[in-house]
Amino acid sequence: MANTPSAKKRAKQAEKRRSHNASLRSMVRTYIKNVVKAIDAKDAEKAQAAYVLAVPVIDRMADKGIIHKNKAARHKGRLNGHIKALSLAAAA
């Protein structure tokens, strides 16, 4: 437990940041989940639209350090790969 006033303040700030970061991480997961749902439903247009909405959010969270930049790139790459496979399957 923090004893000095500055340590108490830092503990309060850390808790506030932790809570805010958890909210942002949850938002990223929701955007990713929306893309995955559209992919599972085999709806290429809806998946592409959800992906276009998700990419800036994923990038912004990576820039802020909420998620690692490599994790952001991995999510974007995999989602885009699934969407491309879906649209190729629909075209064939």
UniProtKB/Swiss-Prot annotation:
The annotated regions of Basic residues compositional bias extend over: 7-20
* The keyword Flavoprotein is annotated on this UniProt entry: no
A GO cellular-component term linked to this record:
cytosol
Segment forming the signal sequence:
none
**Gene3D superfamilies from the xrefs?**
Ribosomal protein S20
**What are the recorded Gene Ontology BP terms?**
translation
Against Pfam families, the record matches this protein to:
Ribosomal_S20p (PF01649)
Per the record, the domain of life is Bacteria
Keyword terms of this UniProt record: Ribonucleoprotein, Ribosomal protein, RNA-binding, rRNA-binding
One molecular function GO term is:
small ribosomal subunit rRNA binding
Q: Where is this region: Disordered?
A: 1-23
Purpose of the protein: Binds directly to 16S ribosomal RNA.
Q: What HAMAP family does this protein's entry cite? A: Ribosomal_bS20
* PANTHER family for this protein: 30S RIBOSOMAL PROTEIN S20 (PTHR33398), SMALL RIBOSOMAL SUBUNIT PROTEIN BS20C (PTHR33398:SF1)
Similarity comment text for this entry: Belongs to the bacterial ribosomal protein bS20 family.
The entry's protein name is Small ribosomal subunit protein bS20
Q: What organism, scientifically named, is this protein from?
A: Pseudomonas syringae pv. tomato (strain ATCC BAA-871 / DC3000)
Record lineage: Bacteria, Pseudomonadati, Pseudomonadota, Gammaproteobacteria, Pseudomonadales
